[in-house]
Amino acid sequence: TYAGNSHNLTALMDKDQFKFVKGNIGDLALVESLLAKHDIDTLVHFAAESHVDRSISGPDAFIQTNILGTHTLLKAAKKHWIDGPGNGLFHHVSTDEVYGSLNVSDNAFLEITPYAPNSPYAASKAASDHLVRAYHKTYGLNVTTSNCSNNYGPFQFPEKLIPLCLLNILQGNPLPIYGDGKQIRDWLYVEDHCRAIELIIDEGKFGETYNIGGNNELANIDVVNVLCKIINQKFTDTPEMKKYYPNSP
């Protein structure tokens, strides 16, 4: 994927419990061989095309990865755990985009909120959620699903709002604000997201869906204002930064 960078994994490469395999989740033979070779008992499915704007200009990749790729993983898990000798858990990482959009006066999404995807990305994730549920109901595959809000944190690809704004501020480029910037999003730090997923894997109930949020609901314009204040303070505290970012206002 264009958003992946193997250098982000450098700190893990010498760990005995870590193995890096470059492949495609749509490669059924590869996935089946990995499940069998390593006798995997927990599959956590993070892999996805996830940028809404890209899904609008090019939805095919989202259908291929998010729907067909998920189905490939499910087929491999079924073969190894249901039809074969293994036994395990398939955890599916999804998004709150499947529920649609929130207005200022709306309550937070619940696990029972009806699906109302508004973009090809959201629709592809909604479809994958339903496939995961179907494999549980039809074949008895042990599954859990989590629907998270907007993630942020280290190494995030700079097409997402927070890293893109930070780069644009430092480079003196216009900030990516759509309309009046009043769109409300909940922001979830990536480590908090991972802790929640670990809790679901350890204590979750098979077949259930769990919403994961950061309790940080902000309008996009407010997020941008916070970032501007942080950068401004950094330049105040460390004046020499200006020579590295001469175009920053």
What are these regions (language model features)?
Residues 1-151, 171, 191, 220, ...:
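N-terminal Rossmann-like NAD(P)+-binding domain of SDR-like oxidoreductases, especially those catalyzing
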Residues 4, 23-26, 163, 167-249:
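C-terminal substrate-binding subdomain of Rossmann-fold SDR/epimerase-dehydratase oxidoreductases
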Residues 5, 154-158, 216:
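Residue-level signature of the cytosolic catalytic core of signaling kinases
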Residues 54, 112, 158, 241-244:
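Residue-level detector of alpha-helical hydrophobic segments embedded in or interacting with membranes
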Residues 105, 158-166:
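A glycine/serine/threonine-rich, flexible loop-to-helix segment
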